[in-house]
């Protein structure tokens, strides 16, 4: 027994019935095949427990209750053998019965043991016969008469059998004759064990004509010489004994009171004592490995002893077979509207109960009305339940129709898809009708109520997807302003409102863009991502945007996950509390990111940090220490509220609460280094400098504080602060205006930029966040009036100031406030465009040192991009998530969430100059997320291409690839490509139309509702095949090849324009293309379709991406001179607007802007 042996677990012996009391264990034994401990009880049931935790495994009724307790358990490779007074039973370890043997002469069986043949056991008892049983066949082989009543047996060199008179007989293993007999104990043998050449017994003797007592000696016998050895003294009374399976001369001896002694038989003085916590011990057993000891006590408990560091029942155990986990039945959406055919019913011949006539259907059992959340703070416990004052929101005896509320439609109905509007417009024109395709928010009804319901714009907004994807959704229905909204259906998009607030704070916006323009290439830089997002929102000019890259970076921070700030951690959490924590995290992280590039600069701290010091004074010893107490966010601290004085007490004014929150004097318990213990300490904050941007968390964790915010005009648009000798003076309203007129020294005026609020409309809508922002502060031109806007994800609309700053509604809770110094109004600094760090464009950057294509050459200083420089672009993507599709009962499908793609490769080529068509960027992007599909057929990306350990390509982080494109964008480059709108959306970058040339729309016929593929155009114009299946001589899909082909098509289109044959070319393209299914024919020597001078064209369906090949088609040949090429001209936008879905209704080119 090692020094750390102790009790590992304790369990109760299972009762005989579900409602019965626990019973004592009459037999315990460790399995020598599996990690199981077997227990037999008084009712003939044997139960097994698995592992050191004694997890219940099997339980079997092996013997009838009338036969009494289970008396012994033996183990064989094939199963477990148990013995009762009148039967022998064998089961598998999983509980299946193998055989059950009874005999008329089996009257009082007590013991059993294996014989010399391992497939046979001998059973005996206090009866006149012994029986030999064949384990394999399950029947009695021999019946042996005996004159002894045997109570227990142990097999070693001999079969040692104890009698009921205290003697021990050594029987021959072959014929079971008595070889030697010892009078071991005066009355009876209580326990014994034999191993190798040693036998140890414990028993009872009578002293002085009294009752039998436990002998204080454990007798030892040498089975090799059949002679006794010196006994083991055990003064507590040797009641139970087990020999150690590995240490041949070591034995465990135990008393009935729980004392355990480990003794060496050859050296009785070397002992190890333990005391088990039992009242009365009934038996012990030692595992075959010697690492575990089981104790059975009189309180119906089994104790497992061993070393916590290692405990195994066997040296080499077989794996325990557990029952298969039953498969859960598929979930069924059972409702009154579910047809029986969806569930599956048996055949029937009578009328079903579901055919109940409709005029006999009555509504009963309506759901109870939900509890008004505004009453929760006022609930008081009663004898039964709780009570609260009546809010008097309904009339007397008026009852809420909860069933109608449960079946109500969403408050804000999604608009029609653009494709549907285009079809309706076409139909309306044919019928002579006029329809309004630009529906406004005022035209939508809320549950059939008034059309001008003010709650509409606060409702949850959700993107709907048609088979054409997100481009078919009418975002202009929700936003007719010049300010862009942010899309949902992105992980952590609940932060959209806070990101919009940051964007409209000029000083934060300037810092983010200046940092993005610097040399920062840190992968998880939140400040860079904010700069990219703010630039995208400004370039979008009212079009919808998405913060995919920023939110992915936010989700990658372990700190954010551990603090529970991610969307996956928001279950049962208040959005108000969460967004305030996110606000604190964002500001702390961007401060850290700023110092990564400019570690010695305090520019950001000057803008965001409240510079202060904290003095901590022990209230016991009066010792005081001072430490820095800078903070990026100030949390409002409210005083005790007296409802009667709430409007008259000046302490309840916002300015006074703000001052107390910044100075912050508190008392709590803390560690005192002088007292060397926890004491009551006073903490006082001394402010030295206030920031230019003051971020405040409202901390409305008590409903009583909402009374202050409900006061009209309580939140001021402007506050004035004065820092004087570590003290703060705060003014608002008339006091502020008076001091501004008097030019008070040191007065700094802050104006409110915006508020992030939680909206929780209790009409089956989930809580969400919106922001109210004064957009005039960030305008580049001075404005005389303040214009407030509501940003509800991608719903953006103008609201008046009173509505934005009114918080008397119970469903509108302010969370985050942002104030900025008034002197920084309109301080929109765009100088970052002149100081772009373009080093990344002129040098190679690689994670793995992977090789680039042989033709790639980075830009030289002589090739520095300038405004109007054309570059050809093509990107490839892989699937990170498959689309989530809802299949309805009628078989129709609705896209709930589209597939999620990840940028995998970016190729950029020179579009002009002597090295035209030569790539200078060809980056593969490493992806840490799980890739569900490489879509190799369309992307050319194969497994292993994006793994730094195996990739042979130039791998870079997404941040590096994105920044290269962002630099080209802001240097004024014009991007030439095919299907660029989809690429830009997946990259998450906003490119103005004046910097885009999309060949998908160049070769577009205004009267044909079809867009042609790059693959088809390449064959038709240049007689070349691209995007083919990979072969030995062809690598298959290649983004460099696609970008170069788009560049050549653009040049060719310019030639068509110079020749004045664009319309004729397009007509013939579509006419001949329709014969070929707008697909290139198979390779058979066929030439291009066109027979006109200078042309060779065909086109394709879908979005211009790798349409499968068609059966072989032969086209006519053409041979003609080409039109003269024209020098490069700066191009304008050729990509349609977001809302233009059906190009057949108009001309995107507007008279060919290339001219």
Curated annotation (Swiss-Prot):
Regulation acting on activity, per entry: Positively regulated by the regulatory subunit pan3.
SMART domains for the chain: EXOIII
GO MF entry, a single one: metal ion binding
Pfam families, alphabetized: PAN2_N, RNase_T, UCH_1
Domain Exonuclease: 871-1049
Catalytic activity: Exonucleolytic cleavage of poly(A) to 5'-AMP
GO cellular component, one term: PAN complex
Catalytic activity, EC: 3.1.13.4
Database matches in PANTHER family: DEADENYLATION COMPLEX CATALYTIC SUBUNIT PAN2 (PTHR15728), PAN2-PAN3 DEADENYLATION COMPLEX CATALYTIC SUBUNIT PAN2 (PTHR15728:SF0)
Subunit structure: Forms a heterotrimer with an asymmetric homodimer of the regulatory subunit pan3 to form the poly(A)-nuclease (PAN) deadenylation complex.
Alphabetical list of HAMAP family matching this protein: PAN2 (MF_03182)
Official protein name in the record: PAN2-PAN3 deadenylation complex catalytic subunit pan2
Organism: Aspergillus oryzae (strain ATCC 42149 / RIB 40)
Source lineage: Eukaryota, Fungi, Dikarya, Ascomycota, Pezizomycotina
């Amino acid at each position: 027994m090692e020094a750390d042996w102790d009790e590992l677990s304790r369990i109760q012996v299972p009762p005989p019935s579900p409602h019965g009391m626990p019973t004592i264990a009459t037999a315990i034994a460790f399995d020598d095949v599996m990690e199981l401990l077997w227990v037999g009880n008084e009712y003939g049931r044997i139960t097994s427990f698995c592992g050191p935790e004694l997890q219940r495994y099997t339980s079997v009724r092996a013997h009838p209750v009338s036969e009494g307790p289970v008396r012994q358990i033996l183990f064989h490779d094939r199963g477990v053998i148990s013995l009762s007074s009148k039967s022998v039973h064998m089961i598998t370890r999983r509980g299946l019965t193998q055989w059950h043997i009874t005999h008329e002469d089996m009257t009082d069986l007590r013991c059993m043991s294996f014989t010399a043949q391992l497939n046979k056991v001998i059973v005996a008892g206090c009866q006149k016969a012994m029986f030999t049983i064949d384990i394999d066949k399950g029947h009695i082989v021999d019946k042996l008469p005996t004159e002894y009543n045997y109570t227990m047996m142990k097999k070693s060199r001999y079969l040692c059998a104890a009698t009921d008179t205290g003697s021990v007989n050594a029987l021959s293993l072959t014929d079971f004759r008595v070889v030697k007999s010892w009078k071991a104990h005066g009355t009876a043998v209580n326990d014994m064990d034999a191993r190798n050449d040693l036998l140890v017994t414990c028993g009872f003797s009578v002293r002085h004509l009294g009752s039998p007592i436990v002998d204080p000696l454990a007798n030892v016998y040498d089975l090799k010489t059949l002679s006794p050895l010196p006994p083991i003294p055990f003064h507590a009374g040797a009641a139970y004994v087990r020999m150690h399976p590995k240490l041949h001369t070591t034995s465990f001896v135990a008393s009935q009171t729980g004392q355990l002694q480990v003794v060496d038989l050859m050296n009785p003085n070397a002992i190890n004592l333990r005391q088990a916590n039992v009242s009365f011990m009934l038996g012990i057993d030692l595992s075959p490995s010697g690492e575990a000891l089981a104790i059975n006590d009189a309180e119906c408990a089994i104790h497992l002893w061993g070393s916590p560091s290692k405990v195994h029942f066997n040296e080499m155990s077989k794996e325990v077979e557990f029952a298969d986990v039953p498969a859960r039945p598929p979930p069924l959406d059972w409702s009154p509207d579910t047809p029986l055919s969806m569930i599956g019913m048996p055949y029937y011949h009578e009328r079903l109960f579901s055919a109940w006539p409709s005029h006999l259907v009555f509504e009963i059992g309506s759901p109870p009305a939900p509890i008004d959340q505004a009453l929760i703070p006022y609930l008081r416990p009663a004898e039964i339940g709780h009570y609260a004052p009546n809010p008097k929101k309904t009339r007397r005896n008026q009852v809420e129709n909860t069933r109608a509320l449960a079946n109500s439609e969403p408050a804000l109905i999604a608009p029609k898809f653009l494709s549907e509007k285009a079809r309706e417009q076409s139909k309306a024109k044919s019928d002579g009708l006029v329809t309004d395709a630009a529906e406004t928010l005022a035209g939508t009804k809320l549950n059939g109520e008034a059309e001008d319901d003010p709650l509409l714009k606060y409702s949850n907004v959700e993107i709907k997807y048609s088979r054409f994807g997100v481009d078919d959704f009418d975002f202009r229905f929700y936003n007719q302003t010049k300010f862009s909204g942010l899309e949902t259906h992105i992980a952590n998009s609940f932060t959209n409102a806070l990101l919009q607030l940051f964007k409209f704070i000029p000083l934060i916006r300037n810092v983010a863009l200046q940092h993005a323009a610097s040399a920062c290439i840190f992968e998880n830089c939140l400040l860079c991502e904010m700069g990219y997002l703010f630039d995208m929102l400004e370039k979008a000019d009212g079009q919808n945007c998405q913060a995919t890259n920023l939110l992915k970076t936010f989700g990658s921070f372990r700190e954010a996950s551990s603090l529970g700030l991610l969307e996956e951690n928001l279950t049962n959490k208040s959005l108000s509390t969460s967004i305030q924590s996110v606000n604190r995290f964002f500001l702390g992280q961007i401060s850290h990111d700023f110092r990564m590039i400019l570690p010695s600069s305090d520019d950001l701290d000057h803008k965001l940090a409240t510079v202060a010091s904290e003095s901590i004074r022990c209230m016991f010893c009066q010792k005081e220490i001072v430490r820095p107490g800078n903070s990026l966010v100030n949390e409002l601290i409210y005083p005790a509220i007296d409802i009667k004085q709430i409007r008259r007490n000046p302490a309840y004014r916002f300015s006074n609460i703000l001052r107390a929150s910044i100075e912050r004097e508190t008392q709590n318990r803390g560690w005192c280094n002088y007292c060397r213990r926890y004491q009551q300490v006073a903490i006082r904050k001394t402010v030295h400098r206030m920031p230019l941007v003051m971020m405040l968390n409202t901390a409305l964790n008590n409903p009583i504080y909402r009374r202050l915010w409900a006061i009209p005009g309580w939140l001021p648009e402007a506050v004035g602060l004065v820092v004087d000798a570590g003290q703060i003076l705060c003014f608002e309203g008339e006091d502020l205006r008076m001091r501004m007129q008097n030019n008070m020294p040191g007065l700094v005026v802050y104006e409110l930029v915006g508020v992030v609020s939680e909206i929780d409309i209790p009409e089956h809508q989930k809580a969400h966040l919106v922001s109210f922002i004064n957009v005039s502060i960030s305008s580049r031109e001075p404005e005389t009036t303040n214009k407030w806007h509501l940003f509800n994800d991608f719903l953006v609309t103008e609201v008046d100031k009173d509505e934005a700053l009114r918080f008397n509604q119970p469903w509108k809770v302010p969370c985050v406030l942002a104030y900025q110094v008034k002197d920084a109004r309109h301080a929109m600094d765009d100088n970052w465009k002149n100081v772009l760090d373009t080093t990344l464009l002129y040098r190679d950057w690689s994670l793995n040192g992977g090789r680039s294509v042989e033709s790639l050459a980075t830009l030289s200083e002589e090739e520095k991009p300038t405004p109007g420089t054309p570059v050809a672009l093509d990107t490839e993507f892989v699937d990170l998530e498959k689309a989530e599709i809802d299949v309805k009962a009628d078989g129709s499908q609705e896209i709930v969430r589209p597939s999620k793609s990840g940028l995998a490769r970016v190729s950029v080529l020179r579009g002009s100059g002597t090295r035209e068509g030569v790539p200078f960027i060809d980056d593969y992007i490493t992806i840490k997320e799980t890739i569900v599909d490489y879509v190799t057929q369309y992307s050319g990306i194969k497994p292993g291409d994006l793994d730094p350990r195996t990739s042979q390509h130039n791998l870079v982080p997404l941040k590096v690839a994105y920044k290269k494109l962002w630099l080209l964008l802001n240097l004024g480059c014009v991007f030439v490509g095919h299907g660029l709108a989809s690429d830009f959306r997946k990259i998450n970058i906003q490119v103005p139309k004046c910097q885009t040339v999309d060949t998908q729309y160049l070769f577009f016929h205004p009267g044909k509702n079809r867009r042609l593929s790059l693959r088809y155009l390449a064959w038709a114009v240049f007689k070349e095949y691209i995007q083919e299946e990979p072969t030995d001589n062809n690598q298959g899909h290649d983004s460099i090849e696609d970008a170069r082909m788009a560049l050549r098509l653009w040049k060719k289109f310019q030639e068509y324009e110079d020749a004045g044959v664009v319309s004729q070319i397009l007509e013939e393209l579509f006419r001949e293309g329709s014969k070929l299914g707008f697909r290139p024919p198979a390779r058979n020597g066929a030439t291009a379709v066109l027979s006109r001078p200078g042309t060779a064209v065909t086109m394709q369906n879908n979005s211009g991406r790798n349409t499968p090949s068609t059966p072989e088609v032969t086209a006519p040949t053409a041979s003609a001179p080409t039109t003269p090429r024209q020098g490069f001209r700066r191009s304008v936008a050729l990509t349609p607007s977001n809302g233009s879905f059906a190009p057949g209704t108009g001309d995107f080119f507007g008279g060919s802007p290339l001219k």
